[in-house]
From Swiss-Prot:
Cofactor binding, note field: Binds 3 Mg(2+) or Mn(2+) ions per subunit.
Protein name per Swiss-Prot or TrEMBL: (-)-beta-pinene synthase 1, chloroplastic
Family membership noted in the UniProt record: Belongs to the terpene synthase family. Tpsd subfamily.
Encoding gene, per UniProt annotation: TPS-(-)Bpin1
Residues engaged in binding Mg(2+) 2: D379, D383
Keyword Cytoplasm set for record: no
Catalytic function, reaction form: (2E)-geranyl diphosphate = (1S,5S)-beta-pinene + diphosphate; (2E)-geranyl diphosphate = (1S,5S)-alpha-pinene + diphosphate
Main location: plastid
One GO-annotated biological process of the protein: alpha-pinene metabolic process
Transit peptide interval: 1-51
Species of provenance: Pinus banksiana (Jack pine)
Residues at which Mg(2+) 1 binds: D379, D383
Function summary: Monoterpene synthase (TPS) involved in the biosynthesis of monoterpene natural products included in conifer oleoresin secretions and volatile emissions; these compounds contribute to biotic and abiotic stress defense against herbivores and pathogens. Catalyzes the conversion of (2E)-geranyl diphosphate (GPP) to (-)-beta-pinene and, to a lower extent, to (-)-alpha-pinene.
Domain comment, as recorded: The Asp-Asp-Xaa-Xaa-Asp/Glu (DDXXD/E) motif is important for the catalytic activity, presumably through binding to Mg(2+).
Short motif DDXXD motif, span: 379-383
Length: 628
């Protein structure tokens, strides 16, 4: 199919001089041909009435007599007034100074861990407890050196059978070993999952202690948390996950409502791959503050809790300023006038804030929100609103990267084109400051390939073609938008991404491929029914059923869930594999973006229907301060 076709009444020429940066699978034919493109009036507005839990498809007839589909999405939940009238006192100097004093006090706690009541103490579990808690409370960025020193100490006593509470412990214990294994693996230490085999019985099964003390229960909590950091082929980790999950669910039915039961509930519900660091910190602050054992047995932990609360609230004052900037961009870009799309810029900003809440990463947070908003607009335009011919024109215009290319576009596309053009250029300028080199052409190539994948899907929809599962997934990994959502925001960070590192994090790396696969697979399992109602038959589910005659939707979903589980383990390996030439810190942000998207699809399409879990995330981490 020609990407550009000559319209019947051609009389006016549209000349575009620039050449595309990339040639993708879906080749563009020369754009410089005589085409008459009349500016299309903006379509008449339609009033879409939907409940917060459902999505309907609407068809409207625009002023050009073209029938266009809209998704029936609910409107923006966060108008300007909600954001502009946010107030917080935690930006004041007094709070920051108090936080700095607490940081010094907590650092002293780290440094004094070798002394207890004036005498030498070699408790390994004490060091692990401290590291684990500052990470779960979201304050670990202040203690990188102290954390490394503590974990180096723990690892120096690590054995094939694990560790005990202290260096002189003759018998290893499950709680120390499970927590130690998890923490060491997450920090890149080469620890084998085989260490858990020593906690199985003679017939190779994990067993629980009949006493079921709090210590026994915490051992199972840490075993479950450890089991989620599995690599491919680690059967003992699968066994540990199955056993500990069953144990914890049964335990919840027995114990009273308390801090431990809340901790178990949070761990079971959010695991690791959908437990965003700032969201985890907000939930754990409540749990940690209610744990009377922590507060009474060691008053030093009060410092941890106070610092965590202050840090959380101080960051909200930063978020308010950034949100005001994001709203200005959203309004200035003409986004409010794009009536056919979902407006989820505040939700996307919240996701970014939950995975990168260091103050200096403002460029990442704003860039991610802007990139995701653009991706959403393009997704709705290519999937629903635009005609195939219009979409071909838009894709070709993007490849020319010249504002004059808008002369060739329908009226409703002109503003969208300029939003993409200006924002990508602005993010490239930010990336150049951070990375010391021009990355615009590199970013443009990513956007071109991304739009090519959309054109392919638009052709499938227009012709009613149902591809094979493999064909669909390969294209779908690109059209998921993961790469373009991550690339430019990532480059604005204070993390070096020289070319040899970037190719191991971005395309064509296995890390990027797996991240894109998870987003496509999980997204399809949550969206396929609504997409079908909108006339989009193509999904992982339908393609799998085509390839496997007789397979039901349930069969397809089961297959995809097994695939997702395997991809997650592979992604764990790509992030944490020992002796990698790429630092974990360079890979972590792309990995965490995967976690953010995974969170949005945990129960439903949380981007189309953002009025449930996603709304709660905004309220908990963005709008509501923690009581001091």
């Amino acid at each position: 199919m020609d990407l550009i076709s000559v319209l019947p009444s051609a009389s006016k020429s549209c000349v575009c001089l620039h050449k595309p940066l990339s040639s993708s699978t879906h080749k563009l034919k020369p754009f410089c041909r005589t085409i008459r493109i009349l500016g299309m009036p903006r379509p008449r507005k339609s009033v879409l009435m939907v409940s917060s839990m459902s999505i309907s498809v609407n068809t409207l007839v625009s002023d050009d007599a073209v029938q266009r589909r809209t998704g029936g999405y609910h409107s923006n939940l966060w108008n300007d007034d909600v954001i502009q009238f946010l107030s917080t006192p935690y930006g004041e100097l007094a709070y920051r100074e108090r936080a700095e004093r607490l940081i010094d006090e907590v650092r002293n706690i780290f440094n004094s861990m070798s002394l207890e009541d004036g005498e030498f103490s070699d408790l390994i579990i004490q060091r692990l407890w401290m590291v684990d808690n500052v990470e779960r409370l979201g304050i670990d960025r202040h203690f990188k050196n102290e954390i490394k020193s503590a974990l180096d100490y723990v690892y120096s006593y690590w054995s094939q059978k694990g560790i005990g509470c202290g260096t002189k412990s003759i018998i290893t214990d499950l709680n120390s070993t499970a927590l130690g294994f998890r923490t060491l693996r997450l920090h890149g230490y080469p620890v084998s999952a085989d260490v858990l085999k020593h906690f199985r019985n003679q017939i190779g099964q994990f067993v629980s202690c009949p006493s079921e003390t709090e210590e026994d229960i915490r051992s199972m909590v840490n075993l479950y948390r450890a089991s989620l950091i599995a690599f491919p082929g680690e059967e003992v980790m699968e066994e540990a996950e199955s056993f500990s999950e069953k144990y914890l669910k049964e335990t919840l039915q027995k114990i009273p409502d308390c801090s431990l039961s809340r901790e178990i509930g949070d761990v079971l519900e959010h695991g690791w791959h959908t437990n965003l660091p700032r969201f985890e910190a907000r939930n754990y602050i409540d749990v940690f503050g209610q744990d009377t054992k922590n507060m009474e047995s060691n008053r030093k932990t009060e410092k941890l809790l106070e610092l965590a609360k202050l840090e959380f609230n101080i960051f909200q004052s930063i978020q308010k300023t950034e949100l005001e900037s994001l709203l200005r961009w959203w309004n200035d870009s003409g986004s409010p006038q794009i009536t056919f799309t979902r407006h989820r810029h505040v939700e996307y900003y919240t996701l970014a804030s939950c995975i990168a809440f260091e103050p200096q990463h403002s460029g990442f947070r704003l860039g991610f929100a802007k990139a995701c908003h653009i991706i959403t607009v393009l997704d709705d335009m290519y999937d629903l609103f635009g005609t195939v011919e219009e979409l071909k024109l838009f894709t070709a215009a993007i490849k020319r990267w010249d504002p004059s290319a808008t002369d060739c576009l329908p009226q409703y596309m002109k503003g969208i084109y300029m939003m993409v053009y200006n924002t990508v250029n602005e993010m490239s300028a930010e990336a150049q400051k951070a990375q010391g080199r021009d990355t615009l052409n590199y970013a443009r190539q990513a956007w071109e390939v991304y739009l090519d994948s959309y054109v392919q899907e638009a052709k499938w929809i227009a012709t009613g073609y149902l591809p094979t599962f493999e064909e669909y997934l390969e294209n779908g990994k690109v059209s998921s938008g993961h790469r373009v959502s991550a690339l430019q925001p990532m480059l604005t960070m204070d993390i070096p991404f020289p070319p040899h590192i970037l190719k191991e994090v971005d395309f064509p790396s296995n890390l990027n491929d797996l991240a894109c696969a998870i987003l496509r697979l999980r997204g399809d399992t949550r969206c396929y029914q609504e997409d079908r109602a909108r006339g989009e038959e193509t999904s992982c589910i339908s393609c799998y059923m085509k390839d496997n005659p007789g397979a039901t939707e349930e069969d397809a979903l089961n297959h995809l869930n097994v695939m997702i589980s395997g991809v997650i383990k592979e992604l764990n390996w790509e992030l944490l594999k020992p002796d990698s030439s790429v630092p974990i810190s360079s890979k972590k942000i792309n990995f965490d973006i995967t976690r953010a998207f995974h969170y949005g699809y945990k129960y439903r399409d949380g981007y189309s229907v953002s009025s449930v879990e996603t709304k709660s995330l905004v309220m908990r981490t963005l709008l509501e301060p923690v009581p001091l």
